[in-house]
């Protein structure tokens, strides 16, 4: 999972609840350390207890063995992070955008950016009105 905000943390949490080993990448090393030691994301979701199979990191190369990567990066930083992650992603890795919005220059969708950087990879999108509060509680969205 790329992006340790509320949406990225909730999606990583849901994957961990389903038994997956999850690496949650974020730029903030202190927050990554807090998640690993206290099992909470105090900046965004202080009431959500995270599982032991969810590990946070600020080292982007830690994604190198991932079968699938979900991008939960703000749209204004999406391309920069996608380019930074590119050397650590194999052509077999499934890539999914869970980022809202479009790129400010050119109005590109995030999936278009991924297909430009990773033309051989399978690419998907998670979209729709998914309030973090519903998703965090594993409730169906309305």
What do the predicted segments below correspond to?
Residues 1-48, 58:
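NAD(P)+-binding Rossmann beta1-loop-alpha1 motif at the extreme N-terminus of oxidoreductases
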Residues 138-142:
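A short, hydrophobic C-terminal helix/tail in secreted or cell-surface proteins
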Residues 53-55:
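Short, conserved active-site loop motifs that form the nucleotide-linked donor/cofactor pocket
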Residues 50, 61-64, 68-137:
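Rossmann-like NAD(P)(H) cofactor-binding subdomain of soluble oxidoreductases
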């Amino acid at each position: 999972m790329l992006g340790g905000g509320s949406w990225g943390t909730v999606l990583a949490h849901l994957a961990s609840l389903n038994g997956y080993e999850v690496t949650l990448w974020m730029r903030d090393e202190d927050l990554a350390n807090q998640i690993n030691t206290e099992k909470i994301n105090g900046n965004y979701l202080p009431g959500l207890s995270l599982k032991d199979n969810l590990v946070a990191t600020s080292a982007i190369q830690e994604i190198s063995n991932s079968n699938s990567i979900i991008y939960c990066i703000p749209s204004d930083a999406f391309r920069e992070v996608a380019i930074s992650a590119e050397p650590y992603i194999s052509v077999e890795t499934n890539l999914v955008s869970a980022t809202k919005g479009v790129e400010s220059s050119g109005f590109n969708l995030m999936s278009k950016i991924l297909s430009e950087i990773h033309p051989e990879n399978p690419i998907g999108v998670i979209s729709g009105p998914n309030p973090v509060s519903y998703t965090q509680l594993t409730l169906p969205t309305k």
